[in-house]
């Protein structure tokens, strides 16, 4: 439900704004600020008035902010939707990635890959999808590799355990 509402706000914002990239970057910064527990608590608190919440966000973006951005924040405040800023930022980022045909993905593994190996993997994914994909590495206790690009709906998993199981099944079937 939240994503549907955020999508409508993001569509409206991108239709009236000339520079969607700068607005998306401001919303990304606001999203990080909202992820701080104290700020999130203030935004979702029924005790704090909607005007104070709006003023808090407006003071965070500063006086030199774009008029479109200021009006957008005021509309979100009037409709008590300031807590949707992270979701709106996510939708705008996804739209910008789709527009530029560049996506971000996550590579999860127990050990870090070298820059050359990572570049090869990115090149392979680019050939497969036709889109430029930039992978960020995350270290996990997973034995193997997991590559996911959420905006494209891609998830590839290579685990030692799964390969072992498939090899055993293949040997059993061949006997």
Swiss-Prot record:
The keyword Cell membrane applies. It comes from Sulfurovum sp. (strain NBC37-1). PANTHER family: ATP SYNTHASE DELTA CHAIN (PTHR11910). One of its GO terms (cellular component) is plasma membrane. Keywords: ATP synthesis, Cell inner membrane, Cell membrane, CF(1), Hydrogen ion transport, Ion transport, Membrane, Transport. It is found in: Cell inner membrane. Belongs to the ATPase delta chain family. This is ATP synthase subunit delta. The keyword Cell inner membrane applies. F(1)F(0) ATP synthase produces ATP from ADP in the presence of a proton or sodium gradient. F-type ATPases consist of two structural domains, F(1) containing the extramembraneous catalytic core and F(0) containing the membrane proton channel, linked together by a central stalk and a peripheral stalk. During catalysis, ATP synthesis in the catalytic domain of F(1) is coupled via a rotary mechanism of the central stalk subunits to proton translocation. This protein is part of the stalk that links CF(0) to CF(1). It either transmits conformational changes from CF(0) to CF(1) or is implicated in proton conduction. It comes from the Bacteria. Its main location: membrane. It is a peripheral membrane protein. NCBIfam families: ATP_synt_delta (TIGR01145), PRK08474.1 (NF006291). InterPro entries: ATP_synth_OSCP/delta_N_sf (IPR026015), ATPase_OSCP/dsu (IPR000711). Pfam families: OSCP. F-type ATPases have 2 components, F(1) - the catalytic core - and F(0) - the membrane proton channel. F(1) has five subunits: alpha(3), beta(3), gamma(1), delta(1), epsilon(1). F(0) has three main subunits: a(1), b(2) and c(10-14). The alpha and beta chains form an alternating ring which encloses part of the gamma chain. F(1) is attached to F(0) by a central stalk formed by the gamma and epsilon chains, while a peripheral stalk is formed by the delta and b chains. One of its GO terms (molecular function) is proton-transporting ATP synthase activity, rotational mechanism.
């Amino acid at each position: 439900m939240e994503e549907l509402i955020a999508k409508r706000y993001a569509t409206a914002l991108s239709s009236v704004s000339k520079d969607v990239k700068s607005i998306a970057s401001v919303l990304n910064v606001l999203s990080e600020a909202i992820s701080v527990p104290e700020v999130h608590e203030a935004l979702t608190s029924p005790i704090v008035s909607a005007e104070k919440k709006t003023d808090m966000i407006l003071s965070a973006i500063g006086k030199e902010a774009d008029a479109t951005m200021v009006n957008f924040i005021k509309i979100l405040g009037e409709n008590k939707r300031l807590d949707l800023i992270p979701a709106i930022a996510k939708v705008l980022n996804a739209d910008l990635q789709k527009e530029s045909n560049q996506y971000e993905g996550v590579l999860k593994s127990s050990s870090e890959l070298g820059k050359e190996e990572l570049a090869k993997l990115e090149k392979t994914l680019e050939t497969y999808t036709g889109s430029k994909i930039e992978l960020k590495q995350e270290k996990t206790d997973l034995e193997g590799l997991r590559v996911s690009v959420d905006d494209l709906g891609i998830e590839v998993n290579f685990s030692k355990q799964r390969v072992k199981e498939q090899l055993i099944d293949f040997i059993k079937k061949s006997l």
